[in-house]
Amino acid sequence: ESSSVQAAIDIYGLSDLNQIDSGYPEEIKKLHESEGSPEALWVNGPSLNGEHNADGRKKFSEANPINYIDKAIPPFLLMHGDADKSVSPDQTKILHEALIKAGANSTRYVVKNAEHGGIYWAQPKVNKIIIEFLNGVLKK
C-alpha cells in the first residue's frame, strides 16, 4: 500500500502569507504588520533586529503553500469559520481557488459564526463532513 498522502484536510489554515490580512478591516491589518504577529514569528522567528512582515516578503512567499501546488496533489477539504479573527477566511478561499486552477479536487466549507478554534469545530455536522470526505477519498 502506498505511503503517499491520499487526502488533506485544512481547517482555518494559512495559504498565502502575503495576503494574510485579506478581507480584514484596517485595525486588524495593522496587527499583522508587526514583528510580533504570529506569521512574522513563524517565518522570521523572534525578531531581535526589527524585521517584520514588510521586510520578509521573500521569506513569506517561500513559505506559502499555494506555491507548492502541482497536479499530483491529493483531494483537499478546506474549512474556515466566517468569524475567524486570527486567520482570514480568505486564506482557505485563496487555497481553494489555486487548487481548482491546478486541476486538483478541492471542497471548501465556511462554517457560520465559527471562530479560530472553539466549540463550533466540535459540532456533529462538522465531524460528519470530515468523515464523509475521508470515507469518499480513502474507501474507493
Regions found by a protein language model. Name each.
Residues 1-27, 136:
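Primarily recognizes the serine-hydrolase "nucleophile elbow" in alpha/beta-hydrolase
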Residues 14, 82-84, 113-115:
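Acidic beta-to-alpha connecting loop that harbors the catalytic carboxylate
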Residues 22-68, 101:
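Mobile cap/lid helix-loop segments that gate and shape the active-site cleft of serine hydrolases
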Residues 65-73, 90:
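Conserved serine/cysteine hydrolase catalytic core
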Residues 72, 77-80, 84:
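Short beta-strand/loop motif that positions the catalytic acidic residue
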Residues 85-94:
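Conserved alpha/beta-hydrolase "acid-adjacent" motif
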Residues 114-123:
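Catalytic histidine-centered segment of alpha/beta-hydrolase-like enzymes
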Residues 123-140:
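Catalytic active-site module of serine/aspartate enzymes centered on a nucleophile-bearing elbow/loop
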